[in-house]
């Protein structure tokens, strides 16, 4: 069963030094823990690699905000990565098996 979580780029379109990907939904830590090389902790900025099938996409800062103390009232994960659109879109793409993309 797919999650009802959504995922979207939270920074302006185009290249920049940093980009933010925001994911909101239920049970995100258990759904997405396979993407990160380190364990996430509530409200802690963790420097970790984002990986898929042992391919590392980027080293990122990842912050987990557990429900209900988040922007949306659900679990929220913020991935602060390099702002290259290819990197950001790759990170979102590996999440598609569990998440639906935010429609812009």
Please place each PLM-identified region on the residue numbering:
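A glycine-rich (often HGG/GG-containing) alpha/beta subdomain
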Residues: 1-100
